[in-house]
Design a protein with these regions (language model features):
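Glycine-centered hinge/linker elements that transmit conformational signals in sensory
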Residues: 180-182, 221-252, 299
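Extracytoplasmic "Venus flytrap"/periplasmic binding protein-like
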Residues: 61-128, 137, 159-167, 171, ...
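Hinge/lid segment of periplasmic solute-binding proteins
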Residues: 77, 83, 101-153, 162, ...
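Short, polar/charged alpha-helical segment
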Residues: 47-70, 398, 417
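Short, low-complexity disordered leader/linker segments with a strong preference
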Residues: 1-40, 64, 122, 356, ...
Length: 431
């Protein structure tokens, strides 16, 4: 309770700072060349990871071109870890200038962030992929912009499709399970499909949207998860196909669920699964090394809505005016065609801007990996995720219950969803 009160007090103090009489900055103004300024950028990458190294290299290039601005890159160990450290920093008024946060955490941190429309040019904002930008607004104010963003896509082992004599890739859920049945080869230990709901129930959330369901009302005041039978029906259907040996169930193993399902896919024991496009480049190389042909396609029934995920960049309101302008300049630099395209090629994350898709490096990547275009085209169906500070507690309860339903497939899914919905409403009401 003391930690929460301290966090809220810090939020109020910072909001008061942002409500002063100082006029909004002109987003076209440059930081004065004779005024050195340092910006600190917390991120979710390991310093020695490909993405961490990329960010550091881009910062070095930026500083070489802007000698008055020092960019300090600090890896904070993942989305959950960075949230804990940001909360502690908020309580002690030691927040960094800017940070990457998972998009759903904007509901917790928006009081501490600046309105980016006051610092980024209209041209820069308009060039972001609008499907990815939907989660950057809170109460109509632009608080975050996309950086390392992803969506669930359908990964298939084309080699197994060919062996089963199947050409068409399923585009609806009805086709998905029908195709999974045809792909299943129990003699060879091959499952037609697999499922991992993810630790924050992200995959379940996306499947729910694609079925026309939802978790929370648009105004973030009411849990609607159990208002229809859609959520329970999804779980029940997966339980059925698991019991029939059509869907691979990683929840019955002791290992990490994603690692288990990934290993099954790489070993040719799994023909299809829903996963983040953010692992595309890595998985594609691994599958080639294993002698398999992999493709990435759109999520079944994508047009009904698909969850987006991963990181957005925010700037905190405790930053000085010079730091805010410098941060905006660095964000604009990250969103340049060259840098945005290079990041997609390196990581497999979605291209964050419209124009970077035409960059020569990304065009070459698409020529070599034509199925990745499906991930790009799917962005138009992005569905805004819950933006409430109670979301972490809610998704933890949901993910735990979903895992239980998979571990014990005779569990009544209707009762489980009803229980989670009731718990989630209490969490939402308590804030």
């Amino acid at each position: 309770m003391k930690k929460l009160l301290a966090f809220l007090m810090a939020a109020l103090m910072l909001c008061c700072v942002g409500c002063g009489s100082k006029p909004a900055a002109d987003p076209t103004d440059d930081v004065a060349a004779d005024e050195p300024v340092e910006i600190v950028f917390w991120n979710v990458f390991a310093d020695d990871s490909d993405t961490g190294v990329f960010l550091s290299q881009v910062a070095e290039k930026f500083m070489a071109e802007n000698e008055n601005i020092k960019v300090t890159i600090v890896g904070q160990g993942g989305y959950d870890a960075i949230v804990e450290r940001l909360e502690a920093a908020a309580a002690s008024n030691t927040l960094p200038t800017m940070a990457i946060i998972e998009e759903t955490f904007l509901g917790r941190f928006y009081p501490l962030t600046v309105d980016l429309s006051q610092y980024l040019s209209a041209e820069t904002i308009a060039n972001y992929q609008q499907g990815l930008l939907v989660s950057g607004y809170y109460d109509g104010v632009l608080r975050a912009v996309p950086f390392n963003r992803s969506m669930p896509n359908l990964y298939i082992n084309r080699t197994l499709f060919n062996e089963a004599g199947i050409t068409d890739v399923p585009t609806t859920w009805e086709e998905y399970f029908a195709t999974a049945e045809k792909l299943t080869n129990k003699d060879k230990g091959v499952y037609g499909a697999g499922i991992c709901w993810d630790t924050d129930a992200w995959i379940f959330e996306s499947i729910l949207y694609s079925h026309g369901g939802d978790i929370i009302s648009e105004d973030n005041t009411k849990i609607v998860l159990n208002d229809t039978t859609v959520a329970a029906d999804i779980v029940t259907e997966y339980q059925k196909y698991i019991d029939e040996g059509v869907v691979f169930n990683p929840y019955i193993y002791q290992d990490n669920v994603w690692s288990t399902i990934g290993s099954a896919f790489l070993e040719g024991k799994l023909a299809m699964f829903l996963g983040s496009n953010g692992v595309y480049s890595m998985y594609n190389q691994w599958m080639k090394d294993a002698g398999y042909e992999m493709e990435i396609h759109q999520h079944p029934d994508a047009a009904n809505g698909i969850a987006t995920g991963a990181g957005n960049i925010v700037v905190f309101s405790n930053a000085t005016e010079a730091q805010r302008q410098a941060a905006a300049k660095f964000m604009t630099y990250l969103a340049s065609d060259e840098n945005a395209a290079a990041y997609t090629v390196l990581s497999g994350y979605l291209p964050t801007t419209v124009s970077c898709v035409n960059d020569p490096a990304l065009q070459t990547f698409l020529q070599e990996n034509p199925f990745f275009q499906n991930a790009i085209d799917q962005m138009q169906f992005a569905h805004r995720r819950p933006q409430t500070k109670a979301w972490k507690s809610i998704y933890t309860a949901l993910a735990d219950e979903l895992a239980y339903c998979m571990t014990y497939t005779d569990t009544d899914a209707s009762a489980s969803i009803a229980k989670v919905a009731e718990q989630a409403q209490t969490m939402l009401d308590e804030g």
